[in-house]
């Protein structure tokens, strides 16, 4: 029996309307969705909170980091920091906000980081997982961020200078900050805001519990066609219990939603993704001798447009990798349009060639997975194949079920579902990759 059912969660607004959008282009949401994204004003749950304001920046080099830290400290323990509409607040110094307890931040203006690459590469919070860094870290308990404003990562310079490089290259030393990070935080909610142009991942939750995002719009775009945003995932997590994303739109060049190792109790509802690498479980199993898990995820009412992947499970293979499990995952009501691989189990991650994957297969077990009511069209890049589920010979893949799959390919019909190494009946006709 699945850990999650839709009845366990409050009903949300109906699924988003779908527009035809060019990958990588800026997206202006439809009017009804725009209203969903900027609802901060009615999220006043504590109207009697004391309100703290700080001075705004005079220009893009007027750093108000000290003022922001002062305001956060004053609003802590029951107050609210108000960042006013029509005003800009420039942050040019790293901030340790790990001391928070019962605080609201009402972001109606623009909170913008400087693009001083040399400074940020020397002054940041570092996480060994995939060599991640951040501008700041938020920690503590009962933290609420809401409003109609913008959290701006000012990523263009980062995109320009990182062009041609890869985040997972062992020789990479050009680290780029993550826009929003929680560490050792409990009960964090973010509502209504826009997150714009993160230099790297947009959100990363570390060692945190009960994190929720609702009615958020995430976008990363470049004004330089030869330096597109890279690795600007919408959501990433590490050692997290309780992660909820609802009524949210994501227009980035990498994973739309991608919990990383040891993330459990996941709920996603009404998520719209354009130009992404999909709604992915993982990657996990990257580090030698380390056991990773992702389990108990319920994902429903998702639209995936113009991307590389749709519903994806990904695990590392190779000579020096780890092991673990992806377990108890449900994808339900998933709309696919112009997507290369609508449903995919990738156990040859990251960029592992066929020979190496065969010699050093993944040791991540894949169990209790449901894909239900997945419909739409692939891009045709993989020919007639619309689902590719090939299990590693070094792993157990069992209780994997597909139901109500209505996927087509512009490459022709009938559509093809590939399955190999999976124990039991998957519920639909499938064939081996060598057929």
UniProtKB/Swiss-Prot annotation:
Residues 1-15 form the signal peptide. Disulfide bonds join 256-273, 391-397. GO terms for cellular component: extracellular region. The active site is at residues 254, 277. Its EC number is 3.2.1.67. GO terms for molecular function: galacturan 1,4-alpha-galacturonidase activity; polygalacturonase activity. The keyword Hydrolase applies. Glycans are attached at residues 59, 184, 224, 262, 274, 301, 328, 365, 368. Keywords: Cell wall biogenesis/degradation, Disulfide bond, Glycoprotein, Glycosidase, Hydrolase, Repeat, Secreted, Signal. Belongs to the glycosyl hydrolase 28 family. Specific in hydrolyzing the terminal glycosidic bond of polygalacturonic acid and oligogalacturonates. This is Probable exopolygalacturonase B. It comes from Aspergillus terreus (strain NIH 2624 / FGSC A1156).
